[in-house]
Amino acid sequence: MNRYDELKKHIEENAKLAYDLNYAVAADPELSGCEYRACARYVELCRQMGWPVEENFTKQKTAFRAVVTRPEKAVLKVALMAEYDALPDIGHGCGHSANGAMSFLAAAALSKVKDLPVQIDLIGTPDEELRGGKAVMVKEGVFKDYDLALMIHISSDRTEPNSEVLALSCYRVVFHGQTAHGAHDPWKGRNALNGAMLALHAVDMLRQHVRPETRIGTYIVDGGTASNVVPDRAELECTLRYTSRPYLNEVVEKFMNCIKGAALATETTYEVTPVGLDFDDMVWNKAATEVSASVLTDMGIEYMMPDGSNGSSDVGNVSHQCPALQLYLAAGDTYYPG
């Protein structure tokens, strides 16, 4: 029996566990950093498989690391990454319930392969949609000792042997002013919403002067409470992306100047708070991508190479610490954005 046939056999033997895990997590969505029940399901399954599990991994309450294989003469050390956080309103519309289940299935199948000289860990990486659980792990140096970290991300209609992701920085900006009655004495007020709106106009003008691949998204979180009251507080959320971190840092500096100038012009004050950790762009691993593509070909799965990214993921951070791979696997043949 060759390796593929052996793996196929073990995949089929463990498929129901993975299916049940996927559907259980999908039916019980938990937001980023709050995936307590999902994490507990993974930990229980790992222990049923006989794998030692470290909970609260890197001091993240919904993260874990399970030791899947520890051969005496390992030539490689590989991390399989499992995601399981959901989004507000749409639950597991991004497919993280399936992402994690596929990593578990891969671990379960590989753990049964005889004489496999590879040390394998299954790492539960929560909070991808907000703070970036993998980014936290990178800061702790978790992936320095791995030869490869990989996962599969479900896709609507495209299968790709690897993915490109954009560097991302996200901020909450709060403007503070002075409230006043909008008819009686508005001149006594300092309009925080004016500061926020002027900042948005400045950011819109900035778009002409940044590279075409730059993406800037904004929305008003809080703009006041009544039209006859000068608002003393306004809040924005702003997301900035580019294909590489160094240039994105330049864009962030320009963005901060927009905020600073708007506050100066409206005689308001402001505070800026990062939303989660910075996500980095993906370091493209040619060798791993070629192997991934050859496996897809051997399995008769049609694929396309990435043609530019419009999304971000903390797997990009991982790729700056060790070789990393994130395949996209099509779930259907109709494109859905997101």
Model-derived features: positions:
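Non-cysteine beta-strand/loop elements that form the S-adenosyl-L-methionine
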Residues: 79-81, 171, 176, 325-332
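Short, small-residue-enriched loops and turns at beta-alpha junctions
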Residues: 28-33, 128, 158, 224-227, ...
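Metal-dependent amide/peptide-bond hydrolase catalytic core
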Residues: 197-338
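Residue-level signal for inorganic ion chemistry
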Residues: 25, 137, 238
